[in-house]
Structure formats: structure tokens, C-alpha cells
């Protein structure tokens, strides 16, 4: 009797685990399907940064541009200018205030820069996250405990319109991005190329992996 009960419990546990895995795979497929509906778009964004206690620390704004597959550009204009560009292979971060550029391979930056997933269907990228869905809200959590990001949320409707996204860092600080003035007009691929500005210092992490 005890053995039968044990087997039943193990069976239920196995079914439960499979159910969760299926739900996760289903959420990934649904999110990828929605993202595929908008192959390119640009939008203005409003950013709100909050502390782990929910206190507003900073507000900012800028422009976000995506061209699938694998290209995106996030140009923060205030309160301090900076630029993030993915050219498909390298993720560039430029801080003009200190005149420094950091370069990482996209494949090595996914767990800390989940924005990459908005442009990618690469299985190796998506395998780094657990994904759950609640209607138009998708929650992505990195599997790596070394990731600086605790959670990445995407709000996207069934037509493929991304309305916003947010990150929660390990220390509890959150960044909310709300997209406005969304346009699906053609974007030149030249927007997603990057050259190190003259006089800027390059911190090239690509050769350190």
C-alpha cells in the first residue's frame, strides 16, 4: 500500500513537472509568435527607475528601435545620454559622458541584457530564461544565478504591438519602459551599425570569453 501511494505521488509529481514545462514552452512559443508579427518598429520611450522600496529615483526618455532578426537600438536622451546597439553579433554600450564604449558578444550578454530577446528567435538565447504568460504580460526569469537581472517583463498584445517592458535587478531596483508613438515604418540597417567614436576608450569584452 505504501509503495502504491509512493508511486502515485511520484506520478503526480512527474505530471505536474511536465505540465509546468509545457506551460513554459507554450508561453515561449506564444511570445515568439507575437514578436514575429512586427518585424521592425520604432517608438519613443519613457523610463521610470524605482528603488527596491518603490521610491521613484529617476525618470528618463529616449527612442527604441527594432529590426528583426537580431538588431536593436536604444538611445537614451535624458537625464543622461547613452546608447545601446545590437548589430546582430556585438552588443555595444556607449556612454558619451565618460567617453567610453563597452563591447560584448550578443550571445554572452543575453542573461544580463534581456532586450536582445525582443529581436531574437535563437533557441540558445531563449533557453537562458524561464517564461510564463498572463494574457498580454510575459514574465522572463534568467536561469543563471549570476545574472544581474532578476526578472524581465514584456507587455505585448496579440497583434504584436509591444506596449512596454520592465526589468527588476537582483538588488530590487526596477526600470519601467513605456512605449509611445510606435511606428512600423521602414528602418535602415545603418541605424544598427556602430563605430567607436574618435577619442573614446574601448572596453572590449569579446576577447575575454
Curated annotation (Swiss-Prot):
Pfam families hit by this protein: LolA
Primary location: periplasm
Intracellular or extracellular location(s): Periplasm
Keywords: Chaperone, Periplasm, Protein transport, Signal, Transport
InterPro entries (alphabetical): LolA/LolB/LppX, OM_lipoprot_carrier_LolA-like, OM_lipoprot_carrier_LolA_Pbac
Cellular component aspect of the GO annotation: outer membrane-bounded periplasmic space
Family, similarity comment: Belongs to the LolA family.
Entries under NCBIfam families matching the protein: lolA (TIGR00547)
Name of protein: Outer-membrane lipoprotein carrier protein
Species the sequence originates in: Glaesserella parasuis serovar 5 (strain SH0165) (Haemophilus parasuis)
Gene name, Swiss-Prot/TrEMBL: lolA
